[in-house]
Each structure stands twice: as structure tokens, then as C-alpha cells.
From Swiss-Prot:
Transfers the 4'-phosphopantetheine moiety from coenzyme A to a Ser of acyl-carrier-protein. The lineage of its organism: Bacteria, Pseudomonadati, Spirochaetota, Spirochaetia, Leptospirales. Keywords: Cytoplasm, Fatty acid biosynthesis, Fatty acid metabolism, Lipid biosynthesis, Lipid metabolism, Magnesium, Metal-binding, Transferase. Pfam families: ACPS. Disulfide bonds: none annotated. InterPro entries: 4-PPantetheinyl_Trfase_dom (IPR008278), 4-PPantetheinyl_Trfase_dom_sf (IPR037143), ACPS (IPR002582), Ppantetheine-prot_Trfase_dom (IPR004568). This is Holo-[acyl-carrier-protein] synthase. GO terms for cellular component: cytoplasm. SUPFAM superfamilies: 4'-phosphopantetheinyl transferase. Its cofactor is Mg(2+). One of its GO terms (biological process) is fatty acid biosynthetic process. It comes from Leptospira interrogans serogroup Icterohaemorrhagiae serovar Lai (strain 56601).
Length: 126
């Protein structure tokens, strides 16, 4: 079995600053409609947005797209219950790259603290 791991950590204040500066433009550029809806229904959406941002960055690091390949972050979606197992759903170029590289599955771990959010993505193939 071959695995590829990506991780990311972000200060929640960075995402808060981006949201305050760019508003909906930032949200619509980075998050899918379902992710925006999920996060907006949380008491404090910032840690949830930050965590999802980390998942997207961690996936990009794990997939190693190569030079001059830009992946649309909205095509990397995180689904799952608040305290349950999370699932990564890929679309477009992200899904195509995942399949082309022969990956058969992935695991996601996401965590939030007061000031930071972090995520690890593990891609694997038999």
C-alpha cells in the first residue's frame, strides 16, 4: 500500500481577517455552497471555516498536483456530522487528479482549538 500525507494548520484569526476584509467573495471562492451553509449555522463559524480551509490545503499537499496545476478549493468538499467521521468529496480537476494518480481512498482528521485549526489528509492506494 502506498500513502501520501498532507497536513495544514492555520490561525483562526487569519480566516476571520480574510472574511472581514473580503466577505462573501472570500467564502464563495474557497468554500462550496454546502460548506458555507454548514459553517454559517454554527455558533462561531470561524473555527469550522478554518478547519475546512486546512482540509483543502492538506489535500493539495497530499495529492502533489505539480507545478502550474491550480486546484479549485470548492472542488474539495468536507462532509460529515459535527462530531462524526468526516468524508472528503472531490469534484472536477481534484477528482480527476485523485483517480489519475491511482488513489483508492482517503482519511481526514480535523481539529479546532481556541486559536488554531488543523487537518491531516491521508491518501492511499493498494
Amino acid at each position: 500500500m502506498k500513502i501520501s500525507v498532507g497536513n495544514d494548520i492555520v490561525e483562526n484569526s487569519r480566516i476571520r481577517d480574510l472574511l472581514e476584509k473580503h466577505g462573501d467573495r472570500f467564502l464563495k471562492r474557497v468554500f462550496s455552497e454546502s460548506e458555507r451553509e454548514y459553517c454559517s449555522n454554527r455558533k462561531d463559524p470561524i473555527p469550522h471555516l478554518s478547519g475546512r480551509f486546512c482540509v483543502k490545503e492538506a489535500f493539495i499537499k497530499a495529492i502533489e498536483p505539480g507545478d502550474h496545476v491550480i486546484l479549485d478549493m470548492r472542488e474539495i468538499e468536507l462532509f460529515g456530522k459535527e462530531f462524526g467521521k468526516k468524508e472528503l468529496v472531490l469534484h472536477g480537476k481534484s477528482k480527476e487528479l485523485f483517480l489519475t494518480k491511482g488513489y483508492s481512498g482517503c482519511s481526514v482528521s480535523i481539529s479546532h482549538a481556541e486559536n488554531y485549526s488543523t487537518a491531516v489528509v491521508v491518501l492511499y492506494k493498494e
